[in-house]
Amino acid sequence: PSMLAVEDYLFSLSWLRSIGGLSAMINRCDKNAKVIFNFIDEHDWVSNLSSRLDTRSNTSVCLVFNDRRIENPNEFANNVCFRLESEGVAFDIKSYRDAPPGLRIWCGGTVETRDVESLMPWIKWAFESEISLLNSS
């Protein structure tokens, strides 16, 4: 590997140590995921892809839209993702190709909780915008 890659690795380890190590990283992941789990609890049109609490990820949180008005879930999820990307607030947020249509939000320890908190109103806006288009047709 190049010396830049080695230096980047050393810098990352130093940063990790400075915030409290592994337990701090796990705590950051838990806090980030909790923001999304709370959002899900507050909105009946979205749910966690995993219905089992013991299999939910705290790093790659996957959401599905469960509103009955959505006739084409894949198209709807694509449109929500496109809206978010067009506004510059979320990139590469679409669920994996082989997963059910929805959103995939990275909540790893390098993500700031305030950024996850800032994303939630945008997801609500994109959802409501797309639903309003369904209602108008």
Cite the ranges covered by each PLM segment:
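A common structural junction motif
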Residues: 82-92, 123-131
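Conserved PLP-binding catalytic core of the aspartate aminotransferase-like
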Residues: 34, 47-84
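Glycine- and other small-residue-rich loops at beta-strand/loop junctions that grip anionic moieties
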Residues: 1, 94, 108
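Small/polar glycine-rich anion-binding or flexible loop at a beta-alpha turn
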Residues: 53-60, 96-104
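Surface-exposed helix-capping loop/turn segments at secondary-structure junctions
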Residues: 19-20, 43-49, 131-136
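PLP-dependent enzyme catalytic core of the Aspartate aminotransferase-like
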Residues: 97-137
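Active-site C-terminal subdomain of aminotransferase-like
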Residues: 1-39, 52
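A short linear hydrophobic-aromatic micro-motif
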Residues: 46-50, 89-95
